[in-house]
Amino acid sequence: MHNSEFLSPVQSGTQRGTNRSILNNKKSGKGKKKSVFEAYMTKEEVSAGLKRGELIQGPLRINPKKFHEAYLPSPDGVRDLFIDGVVPRNRALNGDVVVVKLLPQEQWKVLKNDVCEDDDTPGHSTGNKQHALSPHLMKSSAKNPDLIIEAKVDSSAEDGHESALIGCLQKEIKDQDKLGAIEEKTSKQGDPKTFSDDCFQKTAKVVYILEKKHSRAATGFIKPLSDKSSDLARKRALFSPVDHRLPRIYVPLGDCPHDFAIHPETYANTLFICSITAWRDDSNFAEGKLMKSLGQAGEIEPETEGILVEYGVDFSDFPDKVLQCLPQDLPWTIPQEEFQKRKDLRNECIFTIDPATARDLDDALSCKPLPDGNFEVGVHIADVSYFVAEGSALDIMASERATSVYLVQKVIPMLPRLLCEELCSLNPMTDRLTFSVIWKITPQGEILDEWFGRSVICSCVKLSYDHAQNMINHPDKKIEQHELPPVSPQHTINEIHQAVLNLHLIAQNLRKQRFDDGALRLDQLKLTFTLDKESGLPQGCYIYQYRDSNKLVEEFMLLANMAVAHHIYRRFPEEALLRRHPPPQTKMLNDLIEFCDQMGLQLDFSSSGTLHKSLNDQFETDEYSAARKEVLTNMCSRPMQMAVYFCTGALKDETLFHHYALNVPLYTHFTSPIRRFADVIVHRLLAASLGCGPPLKMPKEVIQKQADHCNDRKTASKRVQELSAELFFSVFVKECGPLESEAMVMGVLNEAFDVIVLRFGVQKRIYCNSLPLVNSHFQQVGKRPELTLLWEPEKKGEEPVRQVISIFTLVEVVLKSDNVPLKYTAVLKSPEAQ
């Protein structure tokens, strides 16, 4: 949907939630300019309203493809509050923490199952970033969008919400001047008050912005104002963000290139960064300033920089005051007094296992057999807190960045590269400072003893996951020197090989026990790219294989994180920084349970463990079953909430500490301090608890604030990583396409269906009106959605070919690059061509 609806509602039907009297006033141009938005409440009014329970606060989530729809978590945790329109959103941007006021019940959204097909329940939505309505339907529905009956949707999903509204458009709202009116009824339904509460979704309007979480930066394009003779056009240009959730922005003409006013067409494909500086209550448009020109749209580096700026990722060079916090005498060596304070493990067989390209090696493993048949297993983590003094300029900047950001082509580090890749990185045959957790453990994974402390190690080899996997796959093979990177002469290859095998044995038992105890893992397909060394363009991509060597490392990292969580919580019950994972969202989970029942799928959602077991027991190992499992795993991931950091003193109910997916009472992050600031705080807590570090200066309120910030940056980092992969895949399709693949249907609407492209793991929507069809027909078979396609025959006189599309149908698709930069289309091959 284009931003034209946001800018010129009169041209494309008035938006729901837009007051027509405002529009009429703007058209007339007479008299004083009226306010488009309500004035915000005062801080005092907001504080009093929150205390009385009259107002609700929470993070705002705006639908990426229907920018006039926004959502706020409901206090009851069931169905999100619905903010219907740009005006009720009141200038808040995606991610902002806002305060809302509920609208009267007659303005709530009516939800009804049997009116039209729902695009956000399982089987009807994939959560991918595609329009639910086919393009020609979107045009027709935009003409009169005021009064609709919506299918019963689950508004908690991040990306869906687009309902197929065939035959659902009704007469206009009689009371056109009522702001935010969303009365949805038909003559058959009668008075909305006769419905039960389940038939409604509460609606609200924003009355205050508590915290502007959004960066207020946007990537987009500049263009002249349409009325070039106006005074405004001589002073301003119009900035159109790529992200339609943002308003269009007036920018000073002086910020634009010097020849823009004369030759605007020269910059039609140039990406710019704009910063929003103000948004008055009497304007549909925000005000801002151009920050810089990025380059041509569709090129990797300009697009990447745009993503980073939009999501507030600091990719600037570290300033001198930060670099001054690092050791200045290089090459740096460990001070002699540190050896006296630490356990010396330099003679132990310790090694790293990481991706082949990794340079920030923050964890190492050891496994020594004991005479009694048990093992001494160690997890050794880079001692970042030794170099990052609390309160230093380095500490402050690291806390602000909070996480390293991993793009396809590079890493934006949390810490200066001198630390990430040298002083803290556990590089082979180099003495390094570490924090260790060492267990005495049985082959079955039973822990007999546990030790925490600061240490010094010297890794004997840098193994990749491929190296470790080769050792696991060939337990009896003699690994030759040329098959590995350089190995320390202190340890034999056979010794390392045996240690990997022993770790693998213990890890298998630990993993089995974890899942027997009720853990859940939902693996989704992840794309990896190979890049051309000269151009940096993607020359290949494949789905990453998660193998036994990955699982080996994961099990011991989990074990260390859980052990440290219990330790610091015992010592600091009010100040411990832990990580919790709330259970799935109730409404979405109930929808998924209903869908599985309709599809005859025997899944048990009663706990994380039963879900994991039933999901894995449901399918065989053939390719079709694997594809079905992938579709179902994707559906199961949608109700899941994000895991979050928190300070134990901020939550009084200890049951809320629980980690749903791991099914453990306490968990934290300890094992990646080079790339996560939360781990640095945990290291400080651990050091303080052991008496080998200074007391922590941060009170629990500050720890909670830092935890919230880490959560925000983690979310942003995850999204940036996804967008980077999407960017590279779009370029890959352009450079190497068209690409053919098998795909499986994972959602069916009445004019479109969603597929997961099995070769690449991407999700796309295919519209019926883009196919050479005689016609298409949607129906419910029982409660299962089904779309029948009648293809135009290839030769005259032949009968149309019939194809039935339903959940789990296998189809053949072709991915083709569009003319628009970074866009590609999935085209369904006709049954005759398959």
Curated annotation (Swiss-Prot):
An example of a Gene Ontology BP annotation on this entry?
A: cell division
**Which of UniProt's keywords are assigned here?**
Cell cycle, Cell division, Cytoplasm, Exonuclease, Hydrolase, Magnesium, Manganese, Metal-binding, Mitosis, Nuclease, RNA-binding, Tumor suppressor
Localization per Swiss-Prot or TrEMBL: Cytoplasm; Cytoplasm, P-body
Locations of Polar residues compositional bias?
1-23
Sites where the protein binds Mg(2+): 354, 363
What Gene Ontology cellular component terms go with this record? cytoplasm; P-body
Q: What cofactor requirement does the entry state?
A: Mg(2+); Mn(2+)
Q: Name one GO molecular function term.
A: 3'-5'-RNA exonuclease activity
Coiled-coil intervals in this record? none
By its UniProt entry, which InterPro entries does this protein fall under? Dis3_CSD2, DIS3L2, Dis3l2-like_C, NA-bd_OB-fold, RNase_II/R, RNase_II/R_CS, RNR_Ribonuclease, Rrp44_CSD1
Location of the region described as Disordered in the Swiss-Prot/TrEMBL record: 1-35
Q: Where is this site: Important for catalytic activity?
A: 362
Q: Which SUPFAM superfamilies match?
A: Nucleic acid-binding proteins
The EC number(s) given in the record are: 3.1.13.-
Q: What class of enzyme is it?
A: hydrolase
Domain topic, free-text comment: Specifically recognizes and binds polyuridylated RNAs via 3 RNA-binding regions (named U-zone 1, U-zone 2 and U-zone 3) that form an open funnel on one face of the catalytic domain, allowing RNA to navigate a path to the active site.
| Function statement | 3'-5'-exoribonuclease that specifically recognizes RNAs polyuridylated at their 3' end and mediates their degradation. Component of an exosome-independent RNA degradation pathway that mediates degradation of both mRNAs and miRNAs that have been polyuridylated by a terminal uridylyltransferase. Essential for correct mitosis, and negatively regulates cell proliferation.
Give the record's family classification.
Answer: Belongs to the RNR ribonuclease family. DIS3L2 subfamily.
Protein name in the entry: DIS3-like exonuclease 2
**What species was this sequence derived from?**
Xenopus tropicalis (Western clawed frog)
